[in-house]
Amino acid sequence: MSLFICFCCQEPGASDEYNIINYGIGGQIEVHVDYWSPENKRSGGARVAPFLGYLTSLQHGGMTVFPGLGLAVSPEAGSALFWLTVNTAEDYDSRMYHMGCPVGRGNKWVLSKWIYSDSQMWSFPCARREGNYPSFTNQS
């Protein structure tokens, strides 16, 4: 089985600018989900896919943890996480709650970007038509 995902990120409003974030010793982020409900979404639509790139490696702490998936990822320079926060109906996936554990030693530097739904029309042309909600991924 192969997995292919393609998102449009170049047109205005398709995604946020890249953010570089630093967490020093003890730095962390509490459990949250990268999602805005349709009632509160910004222009550009719902956040559908966060990208988190690790710019530094850590020996102690700083893991990104998804409690609902039983998944913990240690920061390793040059690696990245990418996940979907919603289905094509823009309903959030509760398994995508995550947190950044406290940094034990050193500095955790990450690069983040959020991709929004409204600019994905050509990636998923039937996603919002008459309740037709296919998967965001094409599997073969």
Q: How does the language model describe each region?
A:
Residues M1-F82, V86-S140:
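Fe(II)/2-oxoglutarate oxygenase catalytic core
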